[in-house]
Design a protein with these regions (language model features):
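ATP-binding N-terminal substructure of ATP-dependent carboxylate-amine bond-forming enzymes
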Residues: 1-106
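A conserved helix-loop-beta module that forms one wall/lid of the active-site cleft
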Residues: 97-125
C-alpha cells in the first residue's frame, strides 16, 4: 500500500467532509491528511489526522505561503490540495516556492476562471 501525506486547505467548506472521506477511502493508498483553515471550528477538522490554523490567505499572502511551507516540512507533505478560491489563487501564484506537488491550475488561467466576464470574453467566437 502506497503512503501519501496530503495537505488540504479550507477544510471548513461545505463539501469538505465528503471530499476528505473520499481521499481517506482511496483504494491502494494509506493517506494521512493535514487539514487547515483560518477558523478553529472548521467542520472538516473532525475528518483529518492533523489540523492547523492558518492565516487567511488573501489577507497576507507571504505569511500564508510561509506557513504552508512550514507544514510541508513538518508533515512531509507530498501533495497540496487548495480548496478555497483565495487559497487556490495564492498557492498557484507562489507554487514555485513550495517543495511538493500542488493540485492547482496556472495563476493567470485561474484569474480568468474566477471572473465570469473574462470567461465570457475568452470563450467568445
Amino acid at each position: 500500500m502506497k503512503k501519501i501525506n496530503i495537505l488540504v486547505t479550507t477544510v471548513g467548506g461545505v463539501t469538505s467532509p465528503d471530499i476528505l472521506k473520499a481521499y481517506r477511502n482511496t483504494p491502494g493508498y494509506e493517506i494521512k491528511i493535514v487539514g487547515t483553515d483560518a477558523f478553529e471550528f472548521a467542520v472538516g477538522k473532525m475528518f483529518v489526522d492533523h489540523f492547523e490554523i492558518l492565516p487567511i490567505s488573501k489577507g497576507n499572502e507571504k505569511l500564508f505561503i510561509k506557513e504552508i511551507k512550514r507544514l510541508v516540512k513538518k508533515y512531509s507533505i507530498d501533495l497540496i490540495i487548495p480548496c478555497g478560491n483565495d487559497d487556490n489563487l495564492v498557492i498557484s501564484r507562489y507554487k514555485d516556492l513550495i517543495p511538493c506537488k500542488i493540485m492547482t491550475g496556472n495563476y493567470k488561467d485561474l484569474l480568468i476562471a474566477y471572473d465570469k466576464g473574462k470567461v465570457y470574453e475568452e470563450l467568445e467566437f
